[in-house]
């Protein structure tokens, strides 16, 4: 049985019903509609912590989806799963693919920055100061891009940029 037919909570059921109605009235081709069903099922599985099932659905959606913007969100969600599973390199790969298709996605830019910052922290803990600084600089560049797109978000990142002297631009109010 498809995941969308076994949702147990009210919000998931409501979302599924609304998505089905939208799919029926939107002038989308069958392939795009099928891609959306896989994407929707992937999101549902991801929300339930069923990451393997979510990835299966996202990969199927990627095979069908042609719109670059929609593909960017699928890739972004795949990145989130890999990050949640501790595979930062794989997460970076998918976040970067997402940003390549949609450079105006601050959440992906932020997540890239978070990974570089984390890697910088690890390098510093291991006494690799130069590498840590290079990773922090990478994190700063991605956070600046995210903040330019969403200046009211990422307050902790804005503060970190200021405290570390990496905020030479005036996007922070």
UniProtKB/Swiss-Prot annotation:
Function noted in UniProt: Essential for the assembly of the photosystem I (PSI) complex. May act as a chaperone-like factor to guide the assembly of the PSI subunits.
Pfam families: TPR_12
Gene: ycf3
Name by which UniProt lists this protein: Photosystem I assembly protein Ycf3
InterPro entries xref list: PSI_Ycf3_assembly, TPR-like_helical_dom_sf, TPR_rpt, Ycf3/AcsC/BcsC/TPR_MFPF
Positions annotated as TPR repeat: 35-68, 72-105, 120-153
First-listed, main subcellular location of the protein, grouped into a coarse class: membrane
Family note: Belongs to the Ycf3 family.
Top-level division of the source organism's lineage: Bacteria
Intracellular or extracellular location(s): Cellular thylakoid membrane
GO biological process: photosynthesis
GO CC field: plasma membrane-derived thylakoid membrane
Keywords, alphabetical: Membrane, Photosynthesis, Repeat, Thylakoid, TPR repeat
Membrane-spanning segments: none
Membrane topology of this protein: Peripheral membrane protein
């Amino acid at each position: 049985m498809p995941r969308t037919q076994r949702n147990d909570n009210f919000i998931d059921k409501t979302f599924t019903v609304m998505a089905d109605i939208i799919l029926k009235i939107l002038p989308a081709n069958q392939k795009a509609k099928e891609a959306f069903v896989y994407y929707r099922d992937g999101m549902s599985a991801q929300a339930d912590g069923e990451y393997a099932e979510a990835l299966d659905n996202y990969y199927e959606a990627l095979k069908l989806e042609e719109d670059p913007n929609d593909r960017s969100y699928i890739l972004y969600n795949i990145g989130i799963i890999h990050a949640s599973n501790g595979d930062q390199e794989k997460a970076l790969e998918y976040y970067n693919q997402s940003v390549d298709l949609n450079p105006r996605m601050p959440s992906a830019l932020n997540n890239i920055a978070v990974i570089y910052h984390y890697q910088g922290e690890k390098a510093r803990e291991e006494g690799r100061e130069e590498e840590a600084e290079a990773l922090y600089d990478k994190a700063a560049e991605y956070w600046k891009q995210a903040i330019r797109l969403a200046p009211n978000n990422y307050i902790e990142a804005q503060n970190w940029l200021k405290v570390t002297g990496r905020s030479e631009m005036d996007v922070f109010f």
